[in-house]
Amino acid sequence: MKVLSDKQNEALEKMKNLAAELGSEAAACKQAGISQSVYTAVKKGTYTGDVDKQLAKVIDYFATKEAAAVLYAGTGYVPTTISSDVQKVIRNCQLQGGLAIACGDAGIGKTEACKEYSRQHSTTCVYVTVNPCIKSAKAVLELIGAQINVSSGSVSRLWLDITAKLSDGMVIIIDEAQHLTYKTIESLRSICDHFDAKGQTLGIAFVGNETTVNQLGGKQKAEFAQIRNRTKNTRIYSSKKVQRSDIELLFPDLVNDVPALEFMLRIAQSSQAVRGAVNLYSNAHDNGNVTHKGLVAMAKYMDMAV
């Protein structure tokens, strides 16, 4: 039986604590990147492979997490002008039923608004994010189904099971909706129609960049225009609409540093958007200098156009 070093024993103790935190040893092993069977054998002293190599994975995992813990972690959700308005669009969509669109520049708070709305309305909201690989009707229905415990099947079976599982007054948020195909949007719209026919409401909010309303589908642009005309609310947002008050909420430490605040507002209103401003502040914070001079220097280091 191999004698473990103090560092290796410490890693095993951290794994034990992580398992207690996550609720199972299996979850802890998956998160730390080590096979559960290997971990169990190492603990028991029966592992016949390279123990040092396996425990190095665990040691490196916790070292990475501990190093990351001291970095700037952000302020969590911040109700900026734009993110608050996106939430209003989603709320009205849920109350009225039917389709709604909230789109605009990347990095201005749309996704954070969706996540926050989903957290606040977890029992009546289904939130999914699509991507270039998940955009077909079946793939998106499977994504929605996974959120409400509907098993995969044919497109028709998925549609029927999902409509049976959803209930009056719910809302589905589709983030990164610019990736959706016309057929997928029609499949989703038909869910709204199904509830409307029963005298009930089901809202679907499409959230994404501006192509969500003016470029989706390429050659099928006219068909998407017809869908847009059937939406009850369409909002288009721009980084240029970011307010000084938003910057004060996002970076409260800068409230008394007017030059720094104005500089961050310029960044947020540019193509860098709010996300770029947050990244800049994060790097400057970790570098130990969030003064105006420090922020400008970091922006230059990051090759930001300012």
Question: Model features per residue range: what roles?
Answer:
Residues 66-80:
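Conserved adenine-nucleotide phosphate-binding loops and their immediately adjacent elements
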Residues 77-94:
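Pre-Walker A adenine-sensing motif
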Residues 95-116, 132-133:
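Walker A/P-loop nucleotide-binding motif
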Residues 104-106, 180, 195-223:
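Sensor-1/coupling segment of RecA-like P-loop NTPase cores
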Residues 123, 219-240:
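A short helix-turn-beta junction within AAA+ P-loop NTPase domains corresponding to the substrate/partner-engaging
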Residues 122-132:
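Conserved catalytic segments around the Walker B and adjacent sensor/switch elements
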Residues 68-69, 136-143, 150-190, 196-205, ...:
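Mid-core helix/loop region of P-loop NTP-binding domains shared across ATPases and GTPases
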Residues 1-60, 226, 233, 240-306:
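C-terminal alpha-helical "lid" subdomain
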